[in-house]
C-alpha cells in the first residue's frame, strides 16, 4: 500500500500519526509514504487526479490498485485490516464517542484553524484577511470549549 501525503496538512498528518501510533504498538502495516508537492501543484496534475479526483491528500492506494481518499475512511480501513492492537476499541458507545471527537476536531477545529492560518500568515502567500480570521477564531471557540 502507498499513502500519498503532504507534510503539515491536517488530514494527512492525522493518518500519519495513526500509522505511527500503530507502529509503536508493534503493527507494521508496510505502507510506503509518498509526498505530493502541493506547493508546486502536483495534487492537481492528472497523475494524482487518478488517485483522488478531488485533488486532495491523503490518498491510500490499496494492493488491488484502488484508492481510499478520506482520512477517517483510511483510518477505519486500517483498523479493520490490522485489528491486532487497534486504537479505536471498546464498546460501540466508546467507539462512537471516539469517532464523534475525531469529527468535531476535523470539521470544527482543524479546518477553521487552517483557514485562520491562511487568513493571518499564509504559508502559501494568500493575502491577509483580518475579518475572516476573527470570524474563524470565534467559530472555533465552542468546539474548543467542548
Segments (PLM) and residue ranges:
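GST-like domain detector, emphasizing the conserved glutathione-binding G-site
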Residues: 1-138
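Short, intrinsically disordered, charge-balanced linker/junction segments flanking boundaries
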Residues: 136-146
Amino acid at each position: 500500500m502507498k499513502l500519498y501525503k503532504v507534510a503539515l496538512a491536517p488530514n494527512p498528518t492525522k493518518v500519519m500519526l495513526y500509522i505511527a501510533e500503530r507502529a509503536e504498538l508493534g503493527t507494521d502495516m508496510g505502507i510506503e509514504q509518498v509526498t505530493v508537492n502541493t506547493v508546486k501543484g502536483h495534487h492537481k496534475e492528472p497523475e494524482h487526479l487518478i488517485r483522488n479526483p478531488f485533488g486532495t491528500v491523503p490518498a491510500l492506494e490499496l494492493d488491488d490498485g484502488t484508492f481510499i481518499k478520506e482520512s477517517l475512511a483510511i483510518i477505519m480501513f486500517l483498523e479493520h485490516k490490522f485489528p491486532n492492537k487497534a486504537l479505536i476499541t471498546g464498546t460501540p458507545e466508546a467507539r462512537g464517542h471516539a469517532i464523534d471527537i475525531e469529527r468535531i476536531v476535523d470539521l470544527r477545529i482543524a479546518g477553521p484553524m487552517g483557514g485562520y492560518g491562511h487568513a493571518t500568515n499564509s504559508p502559501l502567500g494568500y493575502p491577509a484577511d483580518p475579518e475572516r480570521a476573527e470570524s474563524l477564531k470565534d467559530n472555533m471557540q465552542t468546539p474548543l470549549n467542548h
